[in-house]
C-alpha cells in the first residue's frame, strides 16, 4: 500500500541510464539509489527489462530512476530488450549515457559509434543527455543531475480556474469498478490540489449532490452560484448536470455552474485539449467496421463494467450509430503507427492505422509521454480524443458545457 502515499509516477522527473551491455549501468544505478535494485553480473545482457526506483533528488524533487538493457543486445530476444529500452525514451527527462571500459567486453569504439545517434535522438525529443564514465564519482553525477535546468514543469490541474477560498464540489461515484477502501489516483490528485490551493472542497457521490448544494448558505453564494467549480467522474456527467441548479442570475464567469470532469482536467494539464476537441468531429464520420484504439496510461484489474473496455465502446457506438471494432492498449504500450524513425535507433512498428484513438486522462503518464502520443497520432493522421469528452457527449452534454 506504500505506493498510494508516494508522488505519482507521472509527476516525477524521469532519469534513465543507457549504454551498451556490461557498461556498468546496473552497478551505477545501485550506487546512485543506495539500494540493490538491479542484478549485477559480468554476463552480458543481465538486465532484460527496465527496472525503476522512485526516490528524491534535491533540488529536483521526486524522481524515477530507471536501469535499462544494453542497446547492443543481440538475437531475437535481444532485439526485444532493445525495443523495451528505447520505449523508456518516451517518458525520460534526463538520459545518462554510461561509458564502459575498453575491457574486451564493451570496446569504447562500439559505444562511441552509437552515442552520437543516441544523443541526436534525445535532443530531438527534448531529453537532456549527460555522460558518465565508469569509475567516476557517483556523488558528482548526482550534482550534475541536480543542476539540470529542465523546461518548465506542467501546470497545476486547477491553474487559472479557481482562486483561494473558492468552493469546489468533487463528485465521486462508488460502483463495482471502484477500488475498495480508497479513491482512484485522478480523484486523489485533484482533491490534494484543491487543498494545496486553499479551496473549500466537498466530496460526495452523485446521489448526494442535492445535499451538497444545500451545505452552502445562500448568503455565501456570489450571484447564486453555490460552487465555483463542480468536478465529476466523466461517467456521471448526465446525472450530475441534471442535479445542478439553473438560477436566473448567472455566475460571474458567465456560466451557471462550471462543470467538468477529472479526465478533462488531466487532458488540459498533460495533453492538448484543443486537439482532443477536434478529434470529436471524427466520431460522426465513423463507419461500420472501423477500428477504434482505446488507450490507457496505466494497467489495472478490469472489472465487469470497466470504463475503457465497456463504457467507452458503448458510448462510441451510441454516438456514431455504427458497429465498431475496438483494440485496447495500456501502460507504456502505444503503437507508432506508420511513423518511421530514421535515427538508426528504432524501426517502425507493424502498420496499424485506426480510424480514431480514445485516450484516458493520463494521470500515470508524464506530460512528455502524453504529448508524444498526440504527436504520433497527428503525424499519422489519426484523430485522437479524450475519455471525458466522449462520455460528456454520450450523456447529452455539449463540448462548451464541460470545457473551462
Kindly label every feature range from the protein language model.
Residues 2-4, 25, 49-52, 80-85, ...:
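A generic local structural motif
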Residues 24, 135-151, 268-269, 396-399:
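Conserved GTPase G-domain signal focused on the G5
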Residues 1-79, 83, 87-94, 99:
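Conserved G1/Walker A P-loop phosphate-binding module
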Residues 41-43, 131-136, 262-263, 388-390:
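Beta-strand->loop->alpha-helix junctions that form or flank phosphate-binding loops
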Residues 53-69, 73-145, 155-161, 182-213, ...:
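Conserved C-terminal guanine-recognition region of P-loop GTPase G domains, centered on the G4
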Residues 38-42, 148-157:
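Active-site phosphate-binding and catalytic loops of NTP-dependent enzymes
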Amino acid at each position: 500500500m506504500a505506493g498510494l502515499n508516494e508522488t505519482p509516477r507521472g509527476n516525477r522527473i524521469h532519469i534513465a541510464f543507457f549504454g551498451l551491455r556490461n557498461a556498468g549501468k546496473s552497478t551505477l544505478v545501485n550506487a546512485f539509489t543506495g539500494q540493490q535494485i538491479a542484478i549485477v553480473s559480468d554476463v552480458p545482457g543481465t538486465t532484460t527489462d527496465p527496472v525503476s526506483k522512485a526516490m528524491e533528488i534535491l533540488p529536483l524533487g521526486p524522481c524515477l530512476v530507471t536501469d535499462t538493457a544494453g542497446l547492443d543486445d543481440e538475437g531475437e530476444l535481444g532485439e526485444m530488450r532493445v525495443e523495451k529500452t528505447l520505449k523508456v525514451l518516451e517518458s525520460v527527462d534526463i538520459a545518462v549515457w554510461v561509458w564502459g571500459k575498453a575491457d574486451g567486453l564493451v570496446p569504447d569504439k562500439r559505444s562511441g559509434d552509437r552515442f552520437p545517434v543516441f544523443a541526436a535522438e534525445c535532443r530531438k525529443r527534448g531529453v537532456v543527455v549527460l555522460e558518465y564514465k565508469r569509475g567516476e564519482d557517483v556523488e558528482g553525477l548526482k550534482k550534475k543531475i541536480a543542476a539540470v535546468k529542465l523546461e518548465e514543469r506542467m501546470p497545476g490541474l486547477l491553474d487559472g480556474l479557481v482562486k483561494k477560498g473558492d468552493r469546489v464540489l468533487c463528485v465521486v461515484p462508488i460502483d463495482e469498478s471502484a477500488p475498495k477502501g480508497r479513491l482512484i489516483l485522478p480523484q486523489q490528485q485533484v482533491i490534494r490540489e484543491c487543498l494545496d490551493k486553499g479551496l473549500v472542497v466537498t466530496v460526495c457521490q452523485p446521489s448526494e449532490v442535492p445535499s451538497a448544494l444545500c451545505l452552502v448558505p445562500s448568503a455565501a453564494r456570489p450571484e447564486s452560484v453555490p460552487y465555483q467549480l463542480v468536478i465529476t467522474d466523466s461517467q456521471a456527467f448526465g446525472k450530475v448536470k441534471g442535479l445542478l441548479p439553473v438560477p436566473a442570475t448567472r455566475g460571474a464567469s458567465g456560466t451557471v455552474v462550471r462543470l467538468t470532469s477529472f479526465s478533462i482536467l488531466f487532458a488540459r494539464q498533460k495533453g492538448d485539449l484543443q486537439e482532443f476537441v477536434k478529434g470529436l468531429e471524427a466520431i460522426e464520420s465513423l463507419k461500420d467496421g472501423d477500428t477504434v484504439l482505446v488507450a490507457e496510461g496505466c494497467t489495472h484489474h478490469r472489472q465487469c463494467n470497466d470504463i475503457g473496455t465497456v463504457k467507452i465502446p458503448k458510448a462510441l457506438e451510441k454516438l456514431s450509430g455504427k458497429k465498431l471494432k475496438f483494440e485496447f492498449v495500456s501502460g507504456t504500450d502505444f503503437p507508432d503507427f506508420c511513423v518511421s524513425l530514421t535515427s538508426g535507433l528504432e524501426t517502425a512498428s507493424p502498420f496499424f492505422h485506426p480510424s480514431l484513438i480514445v485516450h484516458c486522462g493520463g494521470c500515470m503518464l508524464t506530460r512528455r509521454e502524453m504529448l508524444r502520443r498526440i504527436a504520433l497520432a497527428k503525424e499519422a493522421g489519426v484523430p485522437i480524443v479524450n475519455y471525458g469528452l466522449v462520455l460528456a457527449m454520450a450523456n447529452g452534454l455539449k463540448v462548451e458545457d464541460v470545457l473551462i
